[in-house]
Amino acid sequence: MIKAFATILVILLYAVFQSAVPVASEPRHHLKFENQYVRVFDVLVPPGDATLFHTHSNDYVFVTISGANLKAQVMGAQPVDLNLTSGEVRFTKAPLTHRVTNVGSTPFRNITVEILSSPSSTSSAASLENVPGHTLVLDNERVHVYRLVLEPGQSTGIHTHELSGLGVAVSTGEIEIESPGQQRQTVKLQPGDFRWHTGATTHSIKNVGSTRFEAVNIEWK
């Protein structure tokens, strides 16, 4: 009787520890912004720590801000090595239930960008391919993703984002943003800072700082 009870208890405890929470309830995922199109989480996992098993119900892109050596485990499967570097971008289809353990010596941080819906747009063309500083790094049925790299003094020139999107700073930087009919803005950015825009927007970005500036632009199709 005691042995049977102990076995049942072990099974129940295993079920508790294996149960998953929605991503918004996972304590290392910090919700920073949400509208009808996007949810943005700032994720931080210190060395030796792990997320809970959590479920992503929406497709998402993540931008690695601080890389680390990880173990990633999809629920029901064995853990696998996942070594990410700063600036790395990946797209994941939903649904996904998983957890991540930081087995390295550095904090792991990323910006997780959930795609809730697609704004109405008149174009699905890759609108930044010929813009200075931009390189297409990911393209699928949901998003275009570009890496932006500007050395000190470099500028994108005036260009138009035809699609709604989110820009995420990967490095520190001081940039000057100029839009037609508006005053120039000088903005100091930290890694993980982000900006959302709905609909088309036209501007130029110039690196007015003393170090290379890197960012990632995610455009909704």
PLM regions: where:
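Short beta-strand segments in beta-sandwich/barrel cores
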Residues: 51, 68-72, 89, 156, ...
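Short acidic-glycine-tyrosine-enriched beta hairpin
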Residues: 77-93, 183-198
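A short glycine-rich, His/Asp/Glu-containing loop-to-beta-strand
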Residues: 27-52, 57-62, 113, 128-158, ...
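Ligand-binding loop in jelly-roll beta-barrel domains
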Residues: 95-116, 199-221
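Bacterial N-terminal signal peptides that target proteins for export
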Residues: 1-9
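Glycine- and acidic-residue-biased ligand/ion/polar-headgroup-sensing regions
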Residues: 57-71, 75, 162-181
